[in-house]
Amino acid sequence: MRGKTFRFEMQRDLVSFPLSPAVRVKLVSAGFQTAEELLEVKPSELSKEVGISKAEALETLQIIRRECLTNKPRYAGTSESHKKCTALELLEQEHTQGFIITFCSALDDILGGGVPLMKTTEICGAPGVGKTQLCMQLAVDVQIPECFGGVAGEAVFIDTEGSFMVDRVVDLATACIQHLQLIAEKHKGEEHRKALEDFTLDNILSHIYYFRCRDYTELLAQVYLLPDFLSEHSKVRLVIVDGIAFPFRHDLDDLSLRTRLLNGLAQQMISLANNHRLAVILTNQMTTKIDRNQALLVPALGESWGHAATIRLIFHWDRKQRLATLYKSPSQKECTVLFQIKPQGFRDTVVTSACSLQTEGSLSTRKRSRDPEEEL
């Protein structure tokens, strides 16, 4: 039994060991994922490859080997990550997990009610189609009080491209407040009125935690430090990484290392979503793929990355109209809907005969130029 436990522990993810955050990030950045990969590594070799002192390397190896030989291993982070549960409990979680609405009912409908908690959702699309706009919209909407159908949470916004616009967030938050005020006037309930007292512009902005990451090392460091941040901010129900591809496409030429780092990052995001009962949003760029003498736009980072997120949405254009295609979902069928971005944020649009809403044809649309007035 002890031998089986040891073999199991050697497959354990390095981020689950009680290592310092700085060492943990350096190990992952160097491409190490599991304890097994460090089994035959000497302290001097680890020091050189990871960029830490020999004393730190020796201490790291000792901690990992000691943990692997312990009959009752300890896991970093929340104890819920390894708690047993039944299929019935999982079903009940699915029914009560909650959703973050987008204010576009067509988009909410194809997602099953909105962006779901406890799942990772990837939003792909060409520049200017609305990925960052949706991220900012969700950072506001996640804070909607429960009596209005929201989840009353907070948001973490990790920005890799510098696309976050606080003035735009002010517009979205102001529109959201006005919308809820209209609902409260209709209901005339004390609960709604009291909830709006705290749902102010200042409170909304103060509960969006913004982090700017300029390269993949900073991004990995921030993501792997999130468990500590979330333990201090237990109301966070949304983590956004706006521009997951940007740092990896421009700063990393080693494709093998890039794949390992991305896989580790994806697993960390899944763990955060499950352990902290929050939604994860990842935005991705599109790249051109030549297939049978035809140029198609496909999500960046390759096919293996396509399995990382639970849900994949693709935003694209049909003439001057924006469309969203639910390309991948474990519970909803593939579907394409129209949406528009108004000064107030994401909203529904009227289907016209000129727009076919055909998924296959729409997704093969190349990048198009946009009129200046289309930009918000």
UniProtKB/Swiss-Prot annotation:
Residues reported to bind ATP: 125-132
Keyword Transmembrane helix set for record: no
InterPro entries registered for this protein in UniProt: DNA_recomb/repair_Rad51_C (IPR013632), DNA_recomb/repair_RecA-like (IPR016467), HR_Repair_Mediator (IPR052093), P-loop_NTPase (IPR027417), RecA_ATP-bd (IPR020588)
Main location group: nucleus
Listed result of changing residue 131 to R: Partial loss of function
Keywords: ATP-binding, Cytoplasm, Disease variant, DNA damage, DNA recombination, DNA repair, DNA-binding, Fanconi anemia, Mitochondrion, Nucleotide-binding, Nucleus, Phosphoprotein
Phosphoserine PTM sites in chain numbering: 20
Induction: Stress-induced increase in the mitochondrial levels is seen.
Tissue expression remark: Expressed in a variety of tissues, with highest expression in testis, heart muscle, spleen and prostate.
Superkingdom of origin: Eukaryota
Transmembrane spans: none
Position of the signal peptide: none
The name this protein goes by in its record: DNA repair protein RAD51 homolog 3
Subunit field text: Part of the RAD51 paralog protein complexes BCDX2 and CX3; the complexes have a ring-like structure arranged into a flat disc around a central channel. The BCDX2 complex consits of RAD51B, RAD51C, RAD51D and XRCC2; the CX3 complex consists of RAD51C and XRCC3. The BCDX2 subcomplex RAD51B:RAD51C interacts with RAD51. Interacts with SWSAP1; involved in homologous recombination repair. Interacts directly with PALB2 which may serve as a scaffold for a HR complex containing PALB2, BRCA2, RAD51C, RAD51 and XRCC3. Interacts with HELQ. Interacts with DNA damage up-regulated protein DDUP.
Compartmental location: Nucleus; Cytoplasm; Cytoplasm, Perinuclear region; Mitochondrion
Record motif Nuclear localization signal, residues: 366-370
Protein family per UniProt: Belongs to the RecA family. RAD51 subfamily.
GO biological process, one term: DNA repair
Annotated consequence of substituting residue 131 to A: Significant loss of function; abolishes Holliday junction resolution activity
PROSITE patterns membership: RECA_2
Region feature (Interaction with RAD51B, RAD51D and XRCC3): 79-136
Record function comment: Essential for the homologous recombination (HR) pathway of DNA repair. Involved in the homologous recombination repair (HRR) pathway of double-stranded DNA breaks arising during DNA replication or induced by DNA-damaging agents. Part of the RAD51 paralog protein complexes BCDX2 and CX3 which act at different stages of the BRCA1-BRCA2-dependent HR pathway.
